[in-house]
Amino acid sequence: MSTLLIDLKGQELLAEEAELLAHPLVAGLILFTRNFYDRSQIQALIKDIRRRVKKPLLITVDQEGGRVQRFREGFTQLPAMQSFAAMISDPALQLTTAKEAGWLMAAEMTALDIDLSFAPVLDLGHECKAIGDRSFCEEVEPAVRLASAFIDGMHQAGMATTGKHFPGHGHVLADSHLETPYDERPSAVIFERDIQPFQQLIAQNKLDAVMPAHVIYRHCDSQPASGSKYWLQDILRQKLGFDGTVFSDDLGMKGAGFMGDFVARSEKALSAGCDLLLLCNEPEGVVQVLDNLKLEENPPHFAARQRRLQSLFKKKAFSWNELTKTRRWLENSKKLTALQQSWLDSK
C-alpha cells in the first residue's frame, strides 16, 4: 500500500531518488524551493519524474501564498491569506479576491503537472510564529467565508483542497518545525473556536484532505494530533464525519519527535488514522521507513485509502501558455501581485 510522500535533494532527479520513488510504499513527493531554479527547469524536472518513475505519483508543493510560496520567479506573487481581510474593506471584494487567488494558485500549479498544493491554512489568529499571516483571520466566521471562497477557486482549477493544521495551530507560540508545542487552553475553547473552520467546511463538503498539527492539546489528549486516535478517529472521522484523506504533517519536523524514531512516527501516524505520510529533509529516515515499516497485506481500510489517494490527483489543467493567455489569469495575476506588495509595504 502506497503511503509515503518524500522529497528530492536538488534540481535534478538522481538515480537513487528515482529508485526510491518507484518503491511500493511511496505514493508521491513534495517539492521545495531547493528543487526550483526557474519555470523551465521545474517543468523539466516534473516531466523527468513522470517519465522515469513508471507509476502514478502524487506530486505536491506548499504554494499557499505570502511567505510560503516555493516557486516565485516567473510565477504570480500570491498574497498572504491575512491580506484579504486586512487590506480590502469591501466584504464582497474580499471573497472575490480570495476565490481568484485560490483559482490562480491552483491553475499555475496544475499547469506545471503538479497535482496538489497543501492549502488552505484554517488556523485562527496571527500570534503563532509558524502561522502568522498564513491565517485568514482571528475570528471564525470571516475565516470560514474567506477559506470557502479560496477553496471554490481551487476546485474550479481542478485541484483538491487540504485544510491545515487540524484542530488548530494558531494559538501556540512554539514552532512545531523546531519543537513539540503544547496548547494549554481548555478543550471547550478549542471546540468552540479553533475546530470550527474545519467542522463547518467539512459539513459543506469543501475539504478533500486534512492535515493535523504536531501539537499536543493537553486538556484533550496526551499525543500530538498527528498521532492521536482521539483527534483523527473519534473527532475528525466520527464526530465531524470526515471521509477524505488525512495527511500527516512532515514527520521529519522536530515537533514529531515526541512519537519516537522515523519508523515509530510513521507507525503511530498510520495507527492513529493518517492515510498518507510526509517525511521530508531526512533521506536516511526515508530509507529506514522503506526498509522497516510493516503494513498489513490487505488491511480493512485499504480500499478506502486507495480511493482517497486517487481523489487527490488533479482533475484538469491548462498548459502554461494556455493559462497565461486567459483573461482570468491576465487580470488576476496583476491584481494579486499588487495586493501582496501592498501588504508587504504596510508591515
Curated annotation (Swiss-Prot):
The family database entries (HAMAP family) matched by this protein are listed as: NagZ
NCBIfam families named in the record = PRK05337.1 (NF003740)
Q: Which residues form the active site?
A: H177 (proton donor/acceptor), D249 (nucleophile)
**Subcellular location, principal:** cytoplasm
Q: What does this protein do?
A: Plays a role in peptidoglycan recycling by cleaving the terminal beta-1,4-linked N-acetylglucosamine (GlcNAc) from peptide-linked peptidoglycan fragments, giving rise to free GlcNAc, anhydro-N-acetylmuramic acid and anhydro-N-acetylmuramic acid-linked peptides.
Q: Which organism is it from?
A: Mannheimia succiniciproducens (strain KCTC 0769BP / MBEL55E)
Q: Name one Pfam family in it.
A: Glyco_hydro_3
Q: Where in the cell is it found?
A: Cytoplasm
Q: What class of enzyme is it?
A: hydrolase
Keywords, in A-Z order? Cell cycle, Cell division, Cell shape, Cell wall biogenesis/degradation, Cytoplasm, Glycosidase, Hydrolase, Peptidoglycan synthesis
* Reactions catalysed, as given in the entry: Hydrolysis of terminal non-reducing N-acetyl-D-hexosamine residues in N-acetyl-beta-D-hexosaminides
Annotated Gene Ontology cellular component terms: cytoplasm
Q: What gene makes this protein?
A: nagZ
Q: In which pathway does it act?
A: Cell wall biogenesis; peptidoglycan recycling
InterPro entries named among the record's database cross-references: Beta_hexosaminidase_bac, Glyco_hydro_3_AS, Glyco_hydro_3_N, Glyco_hydro_3_N_sf, Glycoside_hydrolase_SF, NagZ_Beta-hexosaminidase
> From the Swiss-Prot or TrEMBL record, what is one GO molecular function term?
beta-N-acetylhexosaminidase activity
Which residues of this UniProt protein bind substrate?
D62, R70, R134, K164, H165
| Superkingdom | Bacteria
> Into which family does the record put it?
Belongs to the glycosyl hydrolase 3 family. NagZ subfamily.
Write down what this protein is called.
Answer: Beta-hexosaminidase
Q: What is its EC number?
A: 3.2.1.52
Q: Which GO terms describe its biological process?
A: carbohydrate metabolic process; cell division; cell wall organization; peptidoglycan biosynthetic process; peptidoglycan turnover; regulation of cell shape
Site (described: Important for catalytic activity): D175
